[in-house]
Amino acid sequence: MLVPKRVKFRRVHRGHMRGEAKGGKTVAFGEFGLQATTSSWITNRQIEAARIAMTRYMKRGGKVWIKIFPHKSYTSKGVGVRMGNGKGAPEGWVEPVKRGKVMFEVGGVPEATAREALRLAQHKLPVRTKIIAREAE
């Protein structure tokens, strides 16, 4: 699973998710990509589940590029814990994905296989997505 090797601070602010992604909005490496149409946090477990779904369907053919990395920790407190007493313990890692960001790319397989693999990955993610093809240069 994807986790940072080292971080300067264990707990970070939640931040805002306004507007569109600044970069990474086009297919850069493969032939097809999975682009977010809504914004959300995506956990390292969700990224891994999508990766496994794609690679299992493609059966060792082609290549998958993961263009997001969960660099932000999220925290939570226990169920019966009262308010106050500081921020909770780090629970996991997330990547804030804004709309327009291409999260996964697939290449080296026929179009039908690539589209089906990306469709399987869509079901593992908490954002609405669309499958896009590389633009002819």
UniProtKB/Swiss-Prot annotation:
InterPro entries the record matches: Ribosomal_uL16, Ribosomal_uL16_bact-type, Ribosomal_uL16_CS, Ribosomal_uL16_dom, Ribosomal_uL16_sf
This protein's encoding gene: rplP
Keywords: Ribonucleoprotein, Ribosomal protein, RNA-binding, rRNA-binding, tRNA-binding
Keyword rRNA-binding assigned: yes
Family: Belongs to the universal ribosomal protein uL16 family.
Classification via PROSITE patterns: RIBOSOMAL_L16_1, RIBOSOMAL_L16_2
Oligomer and partners: Part of the 50S ribosomal subunit.
Annotated HAMAP family: Ribosomal_uL16
GO biological process, one term: translation
NCBIfam families noted in UniProt: rplP_bact (TIGR01164)
SUPFAM superfamilies registered for this protein in UniProt: Ribosomal protein L16p/L10e
Function: Binds 23S rRNA and is also seen to make contacts with the A and possibly P site tRNAs.
Name of the protein this chain belongs to: Large ribosomal subunit protein uL16
Organism: Leuconostoc citreum (strain KM20)
Pfam families assigned: Ribosomal_L16
Alphabetized GO MF terms: rRNA binding; structural constituent of ribosome; tRNA binding
GO CC annotations on file: cytosolic large ribosomal subunit
